[in-house]
Amino acid sequence: MLTLAKIALISSLFISLPFARPQKQNPRRNVTQHTIEDVKIMRNNSIHLERSINVTSENGSDISNLMVTTPSPLNLSTTFRTTNSTRTWLMTSSSESSRPSSTYSVPPLVQGFVSKLPLNSSTADANPLQVSEHSNSTNSPSPENFTWSLDNDTMNSPEDISTTVRPFPPPPKTTPVTPFTAEPTEWLPTNNDNFAGFTPYQEKTTLQPTLKFTNNSKLFPNTSDTPKENKNTGIVFGAILGAILGASLLSLVGYLLCGQRKTDSFSHRRLYDDRNEPVLRLDNAPEPYDVNFGNSSYYNPAVSDSSMPEGGESLQDGIPMDAIPPLRPSI
């Protein structure tokens, strides 16, 4: 429990620091400092926290004095400095039916600490108040008109201020915030030099008509296409003519080759064309011919007759020429 008490004391110190920061003093606000030296001993692990809230109203100013004393088993004196919170309202003078109430919330402390606060305020309560762990004091002003001033940064409120203490904090209220959008109802003036040449209206751009291209090749033939067409026609005609000439040449070569392969025909030819040419005589041969040789030699009785002397001629010693028909005229 001693360790728990130390932890609670340290946590309360750190939590109460933002509420004890010194601020700019206002002549209509008072700052009080109290030094506490009284420390009591813990009893049966049940300690109560007594808190006294002093609220004074001086010329419309709110003063809240918060004093907290935590006892320690070591009897150590602890000094807390509480500073009255100063609220500065930067608003113009206006009158409203009701303003949001100022709420002072006490940080959560461990239940079980006992403290006594000195009663140094004129409006302090006679009896100490016992507050639970989550206690808060709410100052609700009466629904009257408030006056706000920018000169002295003060708030004037009626003297009738009621102090209420609630054992449990009310549930947090969330107020929906609607974003404010301002739309100009008329055109802004353009007298400034920065707007020179600026037109408030939206410029409309006119679209030029698109150009349509039509194919007039049939109506007006292009001269550049004529040579190409003629060239293509010439190529086709030349290919056809070349094929014909090639076929003719091949047929001619084949004909000539086939004509030379024919065999030569037998032709009769005369032994002599001139009658004055001497005729070959068979009797001049050194040996006598065989008359029976293939029955191709003519009969010569002078050769076959061996009784005849050599060199002797007989009447029948020549070739008979009477039977030879007359010569035909040469063609």
Curated annotation (Swiss-Prot):
The chain crosses the membrane at residues 234-254. It is found in: Membrane. Residues 255-331 are cytoplasmic. Highly glycosylated (N- and O-linked carbohydrates). Keywords: Glycoprotein, Membrane, Signal, Transmembrane, Transmembrane helix. Residues 124-162 have a biased composition (Polar residues). Residues 23-233 are extracellular. Residues 1-22 form the signal peptide. Pfam families: Mucin15 (PF15672). One of its GO terms (cellular component) is membrane. This is Mucin-15. It comes from Mus musculus. The gene is Muc15.
